[in-house]
């Protein structure tokens, strides 16, 4: 029997329906938001895999094409590998729920979110996050929810909860935030809503406005949090008992006695590879003492070693008031950069921050190089593309090269969002822009190095960017009332810390953000401090970028295509293309240019050879030229009739050469002067209101073209 719980969410009804689908899953719900319907199932195994001391969580979000009444393309006519949107949404759900499972819960867990119906107004990712939380809430899987995801936009200075696609496009702020109920509340409230996950993009919006948008979004969540409370109270199963991977005090004390001093010495090594080599040696020496038949003890010992490492890193920062590489809390690592290092790329930069290094390369193309994405909710075309690569050698590993994983796609998407607000419009810069960031060395904040390197290679390539963007990763350590915020975190600080908060922007404001936390949530005070400290760091990095290259180059690379845009009348587009593409193929064949023709009459010609471009432009103008009264043309006789001949003076443009205009003397028969296929010089006498053209041969005789 199905049960439905409903509430108002952003002025629209939202319903959670459960009890009649996927009955063998531990938890299964449907969320209905307008005509958007998402089903999420949650299953967690009852026995843990041997040797696993972490949460093996998998989240798969999939959009079925039938959800929008479509049939998939391709030979097999079925859904294939997840697209970028599906991967990014899977990551959002994963990052939101992962920190809310109990410590020591190491049972394989899978959530599958299936979009069954989609409309153009209600975001399926908002519905999917709610369904994921609700499925876990009613299941017996241990989970510290409920959580709610909400999108916040801002149009004309007004915040909007769950804006439509049109409102998102019009706005200057687009946040996706996830909040969690925290009991008891402050200021007399029964509960607070703390931030669990955040990502967003903005048009250089100031920090205060971003914080106001987050506060607005957290308040919007309350009706749906209470809706889940009703659902759990009515239908929730008792949470299962489980055997946690625990570290007893005696084992931790024993491991600490054997390894703590050496670990502290290792964490004084500033170079990552030296530090990790020393730590590996310490771990191996401790684990060797555990015999093979004591598998459970070996696992607990490994967990104790990891806990000890985290404790040491946190103690150094919280108690000794310094970081493992000797920096102060707000200090940025040493930065160096250079541009123009790849001769044939259209722009390039090498950006170094500490031991993190990004090689960013730029390629410019035409509109035919745009990325076309076909999603269930509609198509998207991108003229700015950014790809992030994280090869194994950048962290000193050797493993097979694979296609980009979820992490690489997520980092590339974040860097693209960060740079997008300063990319010139197609009218200002009619190029397709592709940046590739190769991470050559990584010790934290590689996605932020991609932002900085990407901006540098744009400037090196002569792209007229609207501002200078930099990115910085902020960390957090929180114990009781003690809160420490770190700027430009190392990989080890990220691993031992409670937050990874990436903030990108210009000197004017924020362009993109992404926050992941490992604790139950953060409040506004921590968020405000982190953003203020991030701004200081961002401005410092911007100064370093400007010291490398102060403004975009005035000229493009000599190897970049030169794009010229010619406007023709829309009715002349067919003349440019020609029958079966004959004319456009001829232009390409004779000049070697790349040419694109839009239905609105925009003709784009691209070539690194300016003479070839000039020839192609002349051919286009000739193909689309209008007949000019008084001008002499060399035409071809297309048809002969009793009263004259029809002469093509321009491609697709014919005029009437009357028998009386053939010669100065009287002509009795048209074919005495001209026949079909003859070339003839004529003068345009008149173009009437209907576009009909009168020609004269006798007035053109003796004239030169």
Swiss-Prot record:
Localization per record: Cytoplasm
Protein encoded by which gene: pnp
GO BP field: mRNA catabolic process; RNA processing
Protein's UniProt name: Polyribonucleotide nucleotidyltransferase
CC annotations in GO: cytosol
Entry similarity comment: Belongs to the polyribonucleotide nucleotidyltransferase family.
Residue ranges occupied by any S1 motif domain in the UniProt entry: 630-698
InterPro entries: ExoRNase_PH_dom1, ExoRNase_PH_dom2, ExoRNase_PH_dom2_sf, KH_dom, KH_dom_type_1, KH_dom_type_1_sf, NA-bd_OB-fold, PNPase
Primary location: cytoplasm
HAMAP family: PNPase
Catalytic reaction annotation: RNA(n+1) + phosphate = RNA(n) + a ribonucleoside 5'-diphosphate
Domain KH: from-to ranges: 561-620
Keyword tags: Cytoplasm, Magnesium, Metal-binding, Nucleotidyltransferase, RNA-binding, Transferase
E.C. number: 2.7.7.8
Protein function: Involved in mRNA degradation. Catalyzes the phosphorolysis of single-stranded polyribonucleotides processively in the 3'- to 5'-direction.
GO function terms (MF aspect): 3'-5'-RNA exonuclease activity; magnesium ion binding; polyribonucleotide nucleotidyltransferase activity; RNA binding
Residue positions binding Mg(2+): 494, 500
Cofactor: Mg(2+)
